[in-house]
Amino acid sequence: IEGVGKANLRMSVYFFELLKAAGITTHYISADIDKAAMEVLPVKPFGNGLEVICRYRAVGSFYRRYGAYIEEGAALDGYVETTLKDDALGDPLVTPDGLAALGIMTNAQYDQLKDMTQKVAAVVKDALTQKGLDLYDIKFEFGFYGDDVILIDEIASGNMRVYKDGQIVDPMDLTALVLGE
């Protein structure tokens, strides 16, 4: 889609700057929107890549898995789950014990990852709430910078499920709503 790359970069820069102001370390250093380029710290991903989802509502794959136990749209208090980045296997869920057994991260690193996920998601959620938007869930990627667990990749509209007045917001519309474009 025309312009998606720069739109995602603008959105990422917006949130990375909010995180920086909140004292949360990420891989982001700077960006040049015109050149569609972002300067980042050198990081090492977890294993072959790990996606970390923070959920505030029971929707999507969470609801499909657990619908017999929870009402669709029920509130979740920053529930965190992890999946291995593996398209061929459908990005399978992996537990903290599984991550340790596979040598991807220790239990202590998982605790740090979970804490960081909830802090980052809270900053994003608060920013969206101020714009009359409701964050239902968001997907992040983290990695190592030295021994520190930090946010890497992007914080783009396509990585989050957001609602306005009870209706899901299309990712391209979300960028415009958030950035006032």
Which residue ranges define each predicted feature?
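Short histidine-centered catalytic/ligand-binding loop motif
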Residues: 1-7, 89-116
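C-terminal helix-cap and adjacent tail motif
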Residues: 155-181
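Phosphate-binding core of ATP-grasp and ATP-grasp-like enzymes
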Residues: 78-90, 121-132, 156-160
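Active-site loop/lid in soluble adenylation, ligation, and acyl-transfer enzymes
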Residues: 1-84
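Conserved metal-phosphate-binding beta-hairpin within the catalytic cores
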Residues: 54, 135-154
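A short glycine-rich, hydrophobically flanked beta-strand micro-motif that places a catalytic Asp/Glu
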Residues: 27-33, 129-143
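A long amphipathic alpha-helix within ATP-dependent nucleotide-binding catalytic cores
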Residues: 105-136
